[in-house]
Amino acid sequence: MKKIDLNADIAEGFPFDESLLQLLSSANIACGLHAGGAKEMQSAVKFAKENKVRIGAHPSFPDRENFGRTAMALSSQELIAHLRYQLGALKAICDGEGAVISYVKPHGALYNQAAKDEKIARVIAQTVYQFDPNLKLMGLAGSLMLRIAEEEKLQTISEVFADRHYMPDGSLVPRSQPNAMVESDKEAIQQVLQMVTKGQVNAIDGSLVPVKAESICLHGDNQHSLQFAKRIVEELEKNHIKITA
């Protein structure tokens, strides 16, 4: 039986976390610098533990104004400090709840920059390894960040997206472009099944791009995306694909 991990961003201030956590196998918990805060983090950790969902840290640039989606030119030392701050905060909450962090997935602009910027990718990988060498790093399948992470002796998790279109080089179509998002639920479900069962995805130019799908990112920031997440789970189970971290 094929297996796949389902992850989503949690503790970002949206009202669907508890419902979403019943569908997921992994939760990317925001660490306060792009959204959420101590209260949201603690609730998310509790819910994740209750639902036996793997916990991941979801650090970002210090950018609450733009939800962490704006690229920032930080020095290496500044980025290290912000990463340590966020990982440390989540670890303290996990320690208090008897839970553990299993992986790290950068958020938003930090995720996108690390996918193609060697300096940023290496700072992230080295900081995570120094914090806890047993943590895994989750990132875009086939990205530079995952290659750098492996060089830095970190285990990795290759992530694919249900609701994003892909460029021919395997990167995501930027959100600034009109065709960035997969708008149809039917198309998104077909894309997920194609990536999980065949290891490939259709790029926007029609070419087939090979992808290593170990985890699927879902979104749960509105009622429709929550219903869509339920449909994805149903389709995976219907196709005998086990959801597990």
Curated annotation (Swiss-Prot):
Keyword annotations of the record: ATP-binding, Hydrolase, Nucleotide-binding
One Pfam family it belongs to: LamB_YcsF
NCBIfam families (alphabetical): PRK05406.1-3, PRK05406.1-4, PRK05406.1-5
Organism: Haemophilus influenzae (strain PittEE)
Reactions catalysed: 5-oxo-L-proline + ATP + 2 H2O = L-glutamate + ADP + phosphate + H(+)
Residue stretches in coiled coil: none
PANTHER family per record: 5-OXOPROLINASE SUBUNIT A, UNCHARACTERIZED PROTEIN YBGL-RELATED
Family recorded in the similarity comment: Belongs to the LamB/PxpA family.
Stated name of the protein: 5-oxoprolinase subunit A
GO biological process: carbohydrate metabolic process
EC number: 3.5.2.9
MF terms in GO: 5-oxoprolinase (ATP-hydrolyzing) activity; ATP binding
Summary of subunit composition and partner proteins: Forms a complex composed of PxpA, PxpB and PxpC.
Function: Catalyzes the cleavage of 5-oxoproline to form L-glutamate coupled to the hydrolysis of ATP to ADP and inorganic phosphate.
InterPro entries, per database record: Glyco_hydro/deAcase_b/a-brl (IPR011330), LamB/YcsF/PxpA-like (IPR005501)
Top-level lineage group: Bacteria
Enzymatic class: hydrolase
Residues passing through the membrane, by range: none
